[in-house]
Amino acid sequence: MSHVVVKNDPELDQQLANLDLNSEKQSGGASTASKGRYIPPHLRNREASKGFHDKDSSGWSCSKDKDAYSSFGSRDSRGKPGYFSERGSGSRGRFDDRGRSDYDGIGNRERPGFGRFERSGHSRWCDKSVEDDWSKPLPPSERLEQELFSGGNTGINFEKYDDIPVEATGSNCPPHIENFSDIDMGEIIMGNIELTRYTRPTPVQKHAIPIIKGKRDLMACAQTGSGKTAAFLLPILSQIYTDGPGEALKAVKENGRYGRRKQYPISLVLAPTRELAVQIYEEARKFSYRSRVRPCVVYGGADIGQQIRDLERGCHLLVATPGRLVDMMERGKIGLDFCKYLVLDEADRMLDMGFEPQIRRIVEQDTMPPKGVRHTMMFSATFPKEIQMLARDFLDEYIFLAVGRVGSTSENITQKVVWVEDLDKRSFLLDILGATGSDSLTLVFVETKKGADSLEDFLYHEGYACTSIHGDRSQRDREEALHQFRSGKSPILVATAVAARGLDISNVRHVINFDLPSDIEEYVHRIGRTGRVGNLGLATSFFNEKNMNITKDLLDLLVEAKQEVPSWLENMAYEHHYKGGSRGRSKSNRFSGGFGARDYRQSSGSSSSGFGASRGSSSRSGGGGYGNSRGFGGGGYGGFYNSDGYGGNYNSQGVDWWGN
């Protein structure tokens, strides 16, 4: 670098001293339109059209620069540190793209519109076309298409699904559809359905889509893994594309500009856990591809500042856990004034986790439109009395939809119950894993966090590639574990109940209840991680004296699903019922045709099938007593797993799905 001292030319000093800023003569031949402006010497003889002062009415030098600053997180990152330059670039980083771009994107919220405006670099809020016709698709993005739809949709057992009974109750129930093309959902939705390779709607989708498109409130109870998420996302997004943003977009613009504004989502989806919220969000991304709708997700356990920055880019469909949403509302970042669609997913789980005060605060004590004005949907695998009472408060003239038996398990899941003492569980687990193919995903449930860490460490030292998740793990660690499991790098996942609900992990072949849960509903949700969306699966449960409280309900569930019942379980249930009294029985009786099994509006009272009836309703073979019949039989476990052991469970006819 040169350090030569430059002395001012006396003639130049004299010129500057005599400079008159208000003189037209100083313009150096510039256009008279610049009267009164000081023109730097190096620009004085240029054409007016090339002058730096050629600004638009807003004062920005060009549309590119204007757009670059009109949206936080745009692709133009001039003047920012290197870390911030990745925000909004559409990369698949986990939370903040700092050295973690290998992750598959769960929890990633750093995409401004998911590539919709990435070529032009401007925000949807500055594009006047967004106010015109939201039903028209935006230009495609090959990169984004590959990112969203490369997962595929394989192994669907639709033939089996067609036999599942459906019951819909309520006034003027719309007719169901047989194909997606039977109802007009618009060009964007139909194109995205094709990209996801959905060929036919599942039973819950056949009935729920026309109900929601008809703007009716819905309480739907369907088997776990039956396609509930798409059942509400497809019609809701279709309706948003048809109706446009309405007053919500206007409210955002009036509230503030350039990122400092409250967002007014048109649709709100509440979910009990972070994992389920992220899964719904990822599905929403797929079905909002090439649209002007921007989904967002907020949940606890993650950086709230990062989530706020994501919200500030725009939010039309919000997926949230109740606690974090209340926090966002109290911070003034979210307003529900224009929320047209409310979805409560896994509603029973939210009540079990104690979220009812937050849910009522969100729905009843804030600015959300009342029932009858908004459209409300509740989805879950079980609907006990408490949930149906909540539906009475939140839903208006709703339709009750039961797909399969309420609170039931899928017949696509072969259930095996084996007697294993606590000291023998680890060795028995090794026998099972040894008989399982190395490429099969196996989910092992335990009751405690320490138990999860201990079992993971044991399996690791036995040479198995495994990982674990539980409530004490950080959000990043949990997402990394799920990524390793989904990708098959660690085909064994040890989990506590935090992963039991809502996790949509395709191709899970085997669920093992290393520790059985204390209530039968948790059992239903755990084994529902396999056999999803018509695929075949296997569930194995280790049973001993500690699990006596669910004996009766477990027996009823196995009988109902036409599963093999060990004779020792029958004997224990009989003894427990007649000798042990009711003190040890589980709190649930909904697998016997009680309140939760049907629409309470049509039930005159809670009825229950007697123990003797359920016990005598099926014939089962097997040796008596506890001694020689606690395993899978003479062939051993490996023989069952490697044989075509699923077939026998699908030949039954006339299943009494409704508990009559």
From Swiss-Prot:
Residues reported to bind ATP: 198-205, 222-229
Gene Ontology, cellular component aspect: cytosol; membrane; nucleus; P granule
PANTHER family, A to Z: ATP-DEPENDENT RNA HELICASE DBP3 (PTHR47958)
UniProt-listed GO biological process terms: cell differentiation; gamete generation; negative regulation of gene expression
UniProt biased composition (Polar residues): 15-34
Cross-link type Glycyl lysine isopeptide (Lys-Gly) (interchain with G-Cter in SUMO2), residue numbers: 213
Protein name: ATP-dependent RNA helicase DDX3Y
UniProt keyword annotation of Acetylation present: yes
Low complexity composition-biased segments: 603-620
Annotated compartments: Cytoplasm; Nucleus
Modified residues (Phosphotyrosine): 103
Residues with the N6-acetyllysine modification: 55
Chain spans, region Disordered: 1-121, 578-625
Motif (Q motif): 178-206
Chain location of the short sequence motif DEAD box per the record: 345-348
Record family assignment: Belongs to the DEAD box helicase family. DDX3/DED1 subfamily.
Organism: Homo sapiens (Human)
Reaction catalysed by this enzyme: ATP + H2O = ADP + phosphate + H(+)
Role description: Probable ATP-dependent RNA helicase. During immune response, may enhance IFNB1 expression via IRF3/IRF7 pathway.
Biased composition annotated in UniProt, kind: Basic and acidic residues: 1-10, 44-68, 93-121
Pfam families in the record: DEAD, Helicase_C
